[in-house]
């Protein structure tokens, strides 16, 4: 066991040889390296697979072992301060290592097919391999300074990958937005680290936890200063994990290639913020104000993310807001002290969301031959529909991933989300109500994504869409195309006078909501006959989907309670995950309830599943094939006609759509207040610099310049003139001096 721990430091370094080899190849033999570029995918996958084997072995040994601090190198700054670099292996590290390596391997395999025809294939593999290295280094860090170093590397890699297609202005803008937003959090993290170093004189986790256990309860340190420093540390996690109000970068990050969208939102960048809070939770748990603030931010984020996902048309942006909401659940769990539930949901969500993102990439690939390579068309769900006939494997995997995220048993996310909901109700009914209501919203918007993408008919070939030829109910006018005369312009899912609408499209247009259109459709929307249809992707893209499907089906069982001996009327709560986390400090809420009553578990499960099924049902009514059935029964129309508050309900739906489609107006608020405000300040500074500073400088120098210009014409270049003026000046001097 100790022999294995000795070489744990190798895990973050394993992907580096491939990165350096590709770099040297591009410098020394660029032509051969580019011609044989797809060969480099194999060593990238191989080395990360070796890292995964190491991680699994460490995790197995960690179950019955203890945390290991190992120092590799010390840099002595002076006699009083030194920086020690090493690694920390504990259950949290083990979980993250397995998560990063498994998802990373599958994303690399998927990327080989997804990026095969891209000119930046090698550059992409260099970036993504370095991304994995940075994240592996972050989770094995033994102190705050190491975490900050790898934290910045993760941010740098995300900047490069989000702006991978940097020739597209929208992608360049997106990576800048992600960089600037995360700099706010990174600055807070750095200040928090420096603050705790000033308090303790150390950057080691053990010293910080000593403060939490001994000094803070006994008023050994300034509680206000400690709370401020803890808040600054939390600010770093807020930006990295896309929590309100620093969440605005995450939807725009979808401008990068789909594989990196999957990696960012499943196992790397957004997981870094959750990891940081989980690592420092022994410190935060001793500061009740910070814990309450964490839970509040998580609650706001989970609800906000769900509402913003309701009306998105871009499939990747919809999934991005879903990620934001699920990260809010994890943040809420950490804020209420439910450490195990947060990590459990981190695991289950990672595999489910990776499955959904890679599935969306398969959908996008299948749509590009029809609509072109412009993301605002190939990712637009309004142009999809009926894909279940053309890409059945992708459809099946996407459906299972959707149901998992909706919380349908026995899929992965059901177990973790149900645990968070139960703990939130125990902690506060306020948090429980919002979390439970959002669970229903999650089922609604996730099933909406599935139905718009796979249900009905392929809408790209029609100017108006309806699931039945005769029906005008919910005919969808194409985004960006001329709307026919028979279609109501006031609704997204527009109808004739006899139809019913769901969301209003008559909204203020905000700059930045629409993206620059590049490329063109390869088929005519008005064509009656077309032979272009979507097709299933290659095996290198389907294989990761099938493996992730297995994880989605079975990974949730590690959190299922099993009997460890009766205690009273309950069953001892012992799970594989809790056994795995036994060596960690037992500071979570679960410790207060050593057993769970089976009746209580079933009751909570029934409640959460009922909410999920209700959300699925509502989504199916509005977006599924069932709406033609309800129209034939005149069920919906009779409800609307007999409802005296129809106009009020229409206005409510219009406002909901406007709020969701325009991202809650948060982006436009930031643009007007911060972006335009800072630009106005820079213009004012420029005016002051040129008008005042330059004015004073030029005002002093200008008279001297003018006098010199006048004097230089006096001499004329004649020596006799110089002697004449010299004698005159001497005579005047002597005259005044002698008189």
Swiss-Prot record:
Locations listed in the record: Plastid, Chloroplast thylakoid membrane
One of the GO biological process terms: ATP synthesis coupled electron transport
EC class: translocase
Any Pfam family: Proton_antipo_C
Catalysed reaction equations from the record: a plastoquinone + NADH + (n+1) H(+)(in) = a plastoquinol + NAD(+) + n H(+)(out); a plastoquinone + NADPH + (n+1) H(+)(in) = a plastoquinol + NADP(+) + n H(+)(out)
Bilayer-spanning residue ranges: 9-29, 39-59, 89-109, 125-145, 147-167, 185-205, 219-239, 258-278, 280-300, 327-347, 354-374, 396-416, 425-445, 542-562, 610-630, 719-739
EC number: 7.1.1.-
The entry's keywords: Chloroplast, Membrane, NAD, NADP, Plastid, Plastoquinone, Quinone, Thylakoid, Translocase, Transmembrane, Transmembrane helix, Transport
One GO cellular component term noted in the UniProt record for this chain: chloroplast thylakoid membrane
Domain of life: Eukaryota
InterPro entries: NADH_UbQ_OxRdtase_chlpt_su5_C (IPR002128), NADHpl_OxRdtase_5_subgr (IPR018393), ND/Mrp_TM (IPR001750), NU5C-like (IPR003945), Proton_antipo_N (IPR001516)
An example molecular function term from Gene Ontology annotations: NADH dehydrogenase (ubiquinone) activity
Topology class, membrane: Multi-pass membrane protein
Subunit organization: NDH is composed of at least 16 different subunits, 5 of which are encoded in the nucleus.
PANTHER family: NADH-UBIQUINONE OXIDOREDUCTASE CHAIN 5 (PTHR42829:SF2)
Protein role: NDH shuttles electrons from NAD(P)H:plastoquinone, via FMN and iron-sulfur (Fe-S) centers, to quinones in the photosynthetic chain and possibly in a chloroplast respiratory chain. The immediate electron acceptor for the enzyme in this species is believed to be plastoquinone. Couples the redox reaction to proton translocation, and thus conserves the redox energy in a proton gradient.
Entry's family note: Belongs to the complex I subunit 5 family.
Protein name in the entry: NAD(P)H-quinone oxidoreductase subunit 5, chloroplastic
Origin species: Triticum aestivum (Wheat)
